[in-house]
Amino acid sequence: MSLTGFRGLKNNIYDLERVNNLVGENGSGKTSFLEALYLMCTGVSFLTKATETIANHTTKQFVVEGIQAGTKDSNKILVSYKQHKKTHFLNNKKTTQGKMFLKHPICLVDAFVNRVVSGTPENRRRTIDRALFHVEQEYLMEHRAYARCLKQRNKALKDRQTTKQVGAWDESLSIHGEKITRMREKHILEITASFEEMSHLFLGREAKIEFKRGWKGGSLFEALKRNTEKDRALKRTSCGPQRDDFTIGVGGKRAQTHISHGQEKMLSLSYIFSQKTTIEKQTNKNTIILFDETDSNLDEASTNKVIDYLKNVNNQILTATHPHSMLCKKLTGKTIFLKQN
């Protein structure tokens, strides 16, 4: 993997092994390195939508390039950003962001993984979307189509257009929206057994996960019609996939109300790793695990459980941690020391 002009990281070539521990102090570029690999494989950053902010301040451009070995035929992957344009290449041919998601599944554990339990519905929806982008080509198309329709309906509401003009978007919005919600709900059902198994392994307690649609009763089309006057008052669409959510419960109670930060992280990891298992079954591909701030908020016993899990999976792993962390001592692999330019 080679990096040129990516944030504050040095231009360099890195020969990655199966297990790679990125080590450095705060601000050394560990998260940026994970971001670079994620962007190379998926075409997008997990930190920002503003691609121009990733480029080196002097050159205003970057290139991330790598060779994916160990597959039937090695793939050369490249993402470049130049003159305000991002371009994706696979084996020297231009490709699309959607195809990159399908080709290179990633299991991302970022520094805010606790938000699976304690964050907003938007945080949780994003984790489902990332997983489905890797599995369902149709999902990205539906997601984009729904976003376009929602933007137009919300504009009509904000501009105080007539009820008829607002309602003109309801049919297409409901068609795309119901497909998105069905796929999300199906995904949660598919990971449920693995999630319950992982949460028992990590927490030693029974945990349940339940999907909640972003509208009540009947079809989305009916809900949009029923809520038109409410939406006109709010100047936005109040029901649909943008309101989807899921809840996690432990011992019959909502998890975020009565567990510690460490338990939150272990429960969130149970969810992320259950997604990993499901994605691998559905795609017949091993994910790459990117794990930021691996042992943050975890006691020694919990850290050992995570390390044992990572030792026993057949994945390429990149962890980001501090020089004196327990992980560096117990998870054998290549150590990459990082410093910003």
Task: Report each predicted region and the residues it spans.
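Conserved NTPase motor "head" modules and their coupling/switch loops across ABC/AAA+ ATPases, GTPases
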Residues: M1-E25, L39, K164-I175, K179-I288, ...
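Conserved lysine of the Walker
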Residues: K30
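Nucleotide-state sensing region of NTPase/ATPase domains
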Residues: C41-N123, L132-V135, Y139, T192-E196, ...
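Structural recognition of the conserved hydrophobic beta-strand(s) that form the central parallel beta-sheet
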Residues: G66, N315-H322
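Conserved beta-strand scaffold positions in the cores of enzyme catalytic domains, especially
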Residues: I106-L108, I317, G333-F337
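Walker B catalytic acidic pair
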Residues: D292-T294
